[in-house]
Amino acid sequence: YEMYLAYLQQWWDTHKDELPIMAGTPVQGDPQAPFSSPAAQAWQTHLDRLQRRVYDVYDIAALALIHYRVYQKAPNEEFGLLFLDEAQDFGIGIYYVLRTLLPATYFTIMGDVSQNIHYDTGLNDWYELHKLFLKNERDQFLLLQKSYRNTIEISQYAGRILEKASSGRYKIQPVIRHGIPVEETRFWSDLEMAEHTAGLISAIQTKGYHTTAVICRDEKDAAKAHSLLSPLTPLTDGAASNFSTGTMVLPIRLVKGLEFDAVILWNLDMQHGPDDPRQAKLLYVAATRALHELHVLNC
């Protein structure tokens, strides 16, 4: 909660001079000029979403807290136990509201802060949650480090990324299951990389593996990779197949929680990206989607 207030204060200090523009003052004296500042554009986007009755989860949390403070005379005792999975996807403000509105409820909160792909809003460490929830003798924090998904080779590779993503606080302990080494290859051109990728996909399928993912940094890179690969190898619509078979080209944000027999990381620049904790978390999520094989390709 304190972190959220600090964020609001920082936002105010940065954007307070732009408030006349946000309120509708003409830009540079032109009454037809569109909103031009980042703050004004963000405000207009927010208004458009409200008109469509699309609400941000943090706005809903704030409104729930206001409603509780103004109208509710007693805490809500409807829920005895609340389970929360993928806890890293929500910021501490959400948990403050839940704890305030449901003071008598027991919580089981599960997640992996190393897989927080919403770096600016989600949980990047468990510390703030400790302060909010671990106040009684019965409250516990349990750290599960065993990785049953990946081979030792993939887990060790991901572990080196994790050193940056979590400052070394949370380490992987893989089960004993060996596989082939992680392959890293650099190419002169996107076309050369696409041709190599098509060959990899064919070899992976020959081994009897059913699912392969070509994981890209974002939707733009995924669209580019798809256009290069589609003339060279069959690709599957992931939504239509429920990820049960074939080769999918996907951005990182769509693969969290999924797993594939083999993963090809497409131009994610694993050598330089991990220096930034924000990027390291994305790379860690991408690398740990692989069950048996991980190939890292860059151009």
Where are these regions (language model features)?
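Conserved helicase NTPase catalytic core signature
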Residues: 1-81, 94-95
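Conserved helicase motor core of SF1/SF2 NTP-dependent helicases
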Residues: 43-44, 68-81, 88-299
